[in-house]
Curated annotation (Swiss-Prot):
This is Ankyrin repeat and fibronectin type-III domain-containing protein 1. Residues 1131-1146 have a biased composition (Polar residues). InterPro entries: ANKFN1, Ankyrin_rpt, Ankyrin_rpt-contain_sf, FN3_dom, FN3_sf, Ig-like_fold. The keyword Lipid biosynthesis does not apply. Residues 855-887, 945-964, 1106-1146 are annotated as: Disordered. May play a role in neuronal function. CDD domains: FN3. The keyword Repeat applies. Residues 607-614 are annotated as: Highly conserved peptide sequence. The gene is ANKFN1. GO terms for biological process: behavioral fear response; equilibrioception; establishment of mitotic spindle orientation; locomotor rhythm; regulation of establishment of bipolar cell polarity. Pfam families: fn3 (PF00041). ANK repeats lie at residues 133-162, 170-199.
Length: 1146
């Protein structure tokens, strides 16, 4: 029994000991975790690493907080962290622990205050830590020559966060290390981001001394660690010292490499291509490029010096360029008319190199307005409009206060009746289907998404269901509202609603009501910009479209987002009308509408441009020829980067436009005007090529010499004007030439709106606000004057109407000052005397070959065939057809013309529009059916070119081949159809419609190529953006007056033709259906080529020498596209009997 008790006591004692030890271990772990949590809290509150925790914890935290480093630097830092974290003695450890405990336990409030800091303080501490880590990581990447790491750091952090220009403990910046190790790529990247050299290196001696010190200290440290490693043997501490030794050896080699790079480097050479430009009346601009040799050291600075003496003694000033993102320097604050000499020198770590003078060596700050002391056109107009707007608002407030008491009772009665009406007629919904009326459609888009209603429709509200056929003036007034969407409510309140108001005033009131309704439904004031023309259909619907690009896909209460393609496919599957509605046309052409909206917001890069002023008039409006790529500016080519024209250049233009001949003007290489002359000459040729006008037809063209158009945003224009009779093409007037595809005829008012919205934003915003308000006031005062009965009412109405007329007069005066296009138009149409600089003084019309070699940037399709006589077949088809396709600029919004019943005068085709009406590919194929047996495809593209030898040509000759230029000219020749009125039609765009329309089927209407009526509108629109060619032999006509039976003498007087007979080979397009393509190749392998044969009579005499154009000067850089010719095929022409010549009417 006693033994059992003793055994039980032993077991009990053993268990209690075990429990006690486990409890002690648990308490120890709990205490350790508590200390660790306290350290973490202190670390988060102070932004520092804990120093009282265990060595392993300290090392792990420190390891995780640092960026990944190389093995040598990691070991070096690991040893240093252990050295600092390990206590020197147990007493020291206790003392550190006691101090930390007192800090943690002493004051709860102070700890809470330190821990619960504001979010901004903690974020700033974290940012400081990130900056420190990023700076060390940047040094690490530069030392290791890791280009990818440098780019990643510069991408993730800003230069301020990386602290690039703060020297490290060795007194070096990342740029210093990159330069002295001759790491050119990294040095260039750092220089572009704003990196600088260390401020300690004030001279060559200081840099050399600093490098010697770094090398010496690293060598001493390596020697010391090497001795310690050799003496101690294999111990744990010795292993750590070996790691430190490797790190210091690597750093010693780095410093030695930096010192060697500094010793071998030399000062840089002179900068190259140093050009001096006159940029204003008080400034000059110097542009240059890097030296050809930097002598093993990257250039970090440039110095620009200027003086009024040629020997630069004394200097008038200098600029040190540290920012090397652009090698361009503008010298401001100069004296107008004073001659300045400028030179540029480069700097690297070995000092400044020799200076290079500019080309030209000197220049005088000036502007073209200094020639006749002219005031600038754009000066003070915005301030005048701001004052007028304040007066108009004050006048509105005055009259609204006077008339508010009179309208209270009537207002109550009207509001009650209106509320009862709206109780049964809900007007807060979007329109689902269009009935005959006037509507507003809103397009909000983000990338490929468009805002639709809950019924998957474009948001549309009705303006009026009984509108007149012509809404041109109402539409132009509505476009002005796009600059004042936020004032719609104020405008509605300022207009009294009366049933006896005029029709125009009621339409304006309904437009404001519909706009306010759209704003309430969409929950936003900004509805975007108005599309340049309303969309009409044959049902009497007119759709005004506004477009806005949103920044993100935010939610709408009455709408949702949908893919544009999905919306188009749904509408196509749900709606198959016999005649499309305006909504159908909107959805079909929505990509063109969005493209126009995007491009109308884009501006040209700063520079001097040459623009082409060409207008056409219809019944009630004038249209301007612009490009589809940039519809807010005229057709143009760039002359040079400098937008300023100096006084000397403008004086040269004025002298040349007078009686002075070209031979009397000095064009030596030393003349400053020689470069400007060459740039202007090449710009004229490129612009004529772009608008597809041969040189011999541009004999009467001239430059606008009244002023230089300063558009804004450092964009200036010189204008190229046609002959006075061809500036504005009147209805029914024959147009002798047709431009390439990609052009647009924009109404004059809409062109001015989009132009000023891009280049004079503040002015056009103020003008539209004032003009819209004053037009409404004019209608209101006229209505009040008609309704006035007593003498006092008549006198008050007359007084207010006269105030409005005064406002209108002042606004019109300001508008005329800014409206440059009307001044240019009036000048261009003035016949006696002939004004301007004739281009024949710049280029010779006989120099046709040089123009053909210029590659046009606007279009790759060349079509300079003049209009032939009308075809009887076409005339017959014209008489039986009830409608015709519209022009390509109208096809994106109005797909077909209205009938006589609802025909609008604004829809009348201008002569330019008539030029663009063309026959479809089916009509061309029907005309060539007899010659080609129906095998001609719908679309052909040029693939290979072969120029057969003409009579008298030696195939073994080694001289220059004159056929090559003709091959380039005929490479992109397009065949177009012609209307009975002797006009051509060019296509715009290059989207083939074959895959979209499917296969053709025989139908009832042969004029529309077998399509049913509900497909006709779709085919017409699609064909305006496709090419049509047929196979056969074509004859190029010589001029607009040439016929097929013209005599050689008449042809010689009419204009030049091609020099020699040439042939052009055309292959089938890849877009043909496979079955048709294969059948053509198998059945008729010989009918695959198109030959162009000119007239036999030579027009230009062979003894005439072409006018030798000047070669580009040295140092001048002309920004023109390089000519690219087509690939010439070596295959000879086929031997098929195709001697008959088809007329170019095909």
């Amino acid at each position: 029994m006693n033994e059992k008790r003793l055994l039980f006591k032993d077991r009990h004692f053993t268990c209690s000991k075990i429990i006690g030890r486990r409890f002690a271990c648990f308490a120890q772990r709990l205490s350790h975790r508590r200390k660790q949590s306290q350290c973490d809290l202190l670390n988060e509150s102070t932004g520092q690493l804990p120093t009282t925790c265990s060595s392993a914890a300290s090392n792990s935290i420190n390891w995780n907080c640092r960026v990944k480093m190389t093995q040598q630097m990691q070991n070096l830092h690991l040893c240093q962290s252990k050295k600092h974290s390990a206590p020197s003695s147990p007493n020291a450890a206790k003392r550190l622990y006691r101090n930390l405990s007192e800090k943690l336990k002493g004051s709860h409030s102070s700890f809470d205050e330190a821990y619960f800091r504001t979010r901004t303080d903690r974020l700033s501490l974290r940012k400081t830590s990130v900056n420190f880590q990023g700076n060390e990581a940047m040094f690490e990447a530069v030392e290791q020559q890791d280009m990818d790491a440098v780019q990643i750091l510069l991408y993730q952090y800003t230069p301020e966060e990386l602290d690039l220009n703060t020297p490290n403990s060795e007194g070096l910046t990342p740029l210093d290390i990159a330069i002295m190790t001759n790491n050119v790529p990294i040095a260039r990247i750092l220089l572009r981001t704003g990196a600088r050299e260390s401020p300690h290196f004030v001279s060559l001696e200081s840099r050399a001394m600093h490098l010697n010190t770094l090398v010496q200290e690293a060598q001493e440290r390596v020697s010391e660690l090497s001795a310690q490693v050799e003496n101690e043997g294999f111990t744990l501490d010795n292993t750590e010292k070996e790691k430190q030794l490797k790190a210091w050896e690597w750093r010693y080699r780095l410093y030695r490499r930096m010192k060697t790079g500094f010793e071998h480097a030399r000062a840089p050479e002179m900068p190259t291509n140093v050009c001096l430009m006159v940029t204003s009346s008080t400034s000059l601009t110097v542009s240059f490029q890097e030296p050809l040799s930097v002598n093993a050291a990257v250039v970090t600075r440039y110095k620009v010096e200027w003086s009024m003496s040629e020997d630069f003694s004394p200097l008038a000033g200098e600029i040190i360029m540290d920012n090397l993102q652009t090698l361009r320097c503008t010298i401001t604050g100069l004296t107008m008319g004073q001659q300045y000499f400028v030179q540029v020198s480069a700097y690297n770590m070995k000092g400044w190199g020799p200076a290079q003078t500019t080309t030209p060596a000197c220049a005088s700050p000036s502007n073209w307005k200094d020639y006749d002391d002219r005031e600038p056109r754009h000066k003070g107009q915005s301030e005048v409009l701001e004052g007028l707007l304040q007066q108009v608002r004050a006048l509105h407030q005055h009259y609204s206060c006077r008339e508010s008491t009179k309208l209270q009772t009537t207002g109550r009665k009207q509001s009650v009746s209106r509320s009862l009406k709206h109780l049964f007629h809900s007007s807060n919904k979007f329109v689902k289907t269009l009935k005959r009326g006037l509507y507003i459609a809103v397009i909000f888009y983000y990338k490929d998404n468009i805002l639709v209603t809950n019924e998957d429709q474009v948001p549309i509200v009705e303006i009026d269901d009984s509108h007149t056929s012509s809404i041109t003036q109402d539409f132009l007034w509505f476009t002005k509202l796009s600059c004042m969407w936020e004032d719609i409510r104020w405008l509605r309140q300022s207009i009294p609603i009366s049933s006896s108001s005029s029709t125009v005033l009621q339409t304006r009131q309904k437009m404001l009501a519909a706009t306010a309704q759209l704003q309430n439904l969409l929950g936003t004031h900004n509805l975007g910009r108005v599309y340049y023309e309303p969309i009409k259909d044959r049902h009497g619907n007119i759709l005004i479209v506004t477009i806005r690009e949103v920044e993100m896909l935010y939610s709408f209460f009455n709408g949702k987002w949908m893919q544009i393609s999905k919306l188009q496919s749904q509408r196509k599957s749900l709606s198959t009308p016999e005649e499309p509605t305006a909504l159908d046309i909107l959805l079909i052409t929505i990509q063109d509408i969005l493209s126009y909206h995007k491009r109308s917001h884009q501006r040209l890069f700063p520079g001097l441009y040459l623009g082409y002023l060409k207008l056409c008039s219809s019944v009630d409006q004038i249209k301007v020829l612009v490009t589809q790529k940039l519809p807010n500016i005229l057709c143009h080519v760039k002359i040079r980067e400098n937008n300023n024209i100096s006084r000397e250049e403008w004086e040269w233009i004025q002298k040349l436009s007078g009686s002075e001949s070209m031979e009397s003007v000095d064009h030596t290489s030393d003349c400053p005007m020689q470069l400007f002359f060459y740039e202007l000459q090449m710009a004229v040729k490129a612009l004529l090529q772009q608008i597809n006008i041969p040189l011999h037809q541009a004999r009467n063209f001239r430059l606008y010499t009244q002023e230089v158009l300063e558009m804004g945003h450092n964009v200036s224009f010189l204008l190229l004007l046609p002959a006075s009779d061809d500036v504005c093409t009147a209805p029914g007037q024959n147009n002798p030439y047709t431009p390439h595809s990609g052009f647009l005829n924009l109404p004059l008012q809409m062109f001015e709106l989009v132009h000023f919205c891009s280049y004079r934003e503040k002015f056009i915003s103020l003008y539209c606000r004032l003009s819209a308000v004053v037009e409404l006031d004019s209608l209101n005062t006229q209505q009040s004057l008609r309704e006035a009965i007593s003498d006092s009412e008549v006198a008050a109405a007359k007084q207010r109407h006269q105030q409005v007329l005064d406002f209108i007069q002042q606004i019109d005066e300001v508008w005329r000052e800014m409206r440059w296009i009307m001044d240019a138009l009036q000048y261009a149409r003035y016949k006696q005397p002939v004004s301007g600089l004739p281009i024949t003084k710049l280029i010779d019309p006989s120099d046709e070959q040089s123009l053909k070699k210029i590659n046009s940037t606007s279009s790759s399709h060349i079509d300079c065939l003049p209009s032939p006589p009308p075809s009887p077949e076409m005339h017959r088809r014209k008489t039986v057809s009830d409608s015709q396709p519209c022009s390509d600029e109208e096809a994106c919004s109005e797909v077909f013309l209205p009938t006589n019943s609802d025909y609008d005068s604004s829809d009348a085709l201008s002569p330019r529009d008539l030029d663009l009406v063309y026959l479809s590919s089916h009509d061309i194929a029907q005309q060539t059916l007899s010659g080609l047996s129906g095998s001609a495809p719908d679309v052909l593209q040029v693939h290979d070119v072969k120029t057969p030898l003409g009579p008298g040509q030696d195939p073994q000759g080694e001289g220059p081949n004159p056929d090559h230029s003709c091959a380039e000219f005929l490479h992109s020749l397009t065949l177009t159809g012609f209307t009975p009125k002797n006009h051509a039609k060019t296509v715009s765009g290059g989207r083939p419609p074959l895959g979209f329309l499917g296969k053709r089927k025989p139908g009832k209407h042969p004029h529309y190529g077998g399509f049913s009526r509900h497909h006709r509108w779709l085919r017409i629109h699609s064909e305006t953006q496709s090419l049509s060619l047929s196979e056969g032999i074509y004859t190029q006509h010589l001029s607009q007056a040439c016929g097929l039976a013209q005599e050689p003498k008449e042809a010689k007087r009419a204009g030049p033709a091609l020099d020699d007979p040439r042939g052009l080979t055309l292959a089938h397009a890849a877009s043909l259906p496979e079955e048709r393509n294969s059948s053509l190749q198998d059945a008729r392998p010989s009918v695959r080529r198109l030959y162009v044969e000119p007239y036999a009579a030579a027009v230009v005499a062979q003894d005439e020498k072409p006018w030798a154009s000047l070669s580009p000067p040295s140092g001048g850089r002309i920004t023109l596209p390089s000519p690219t010719g087509p690939d010439v095929s070596q295959e000879g022409p086929t031997a098929s009997p195709m001697s008959e010549i088809l007329s170019s009417m095909l």
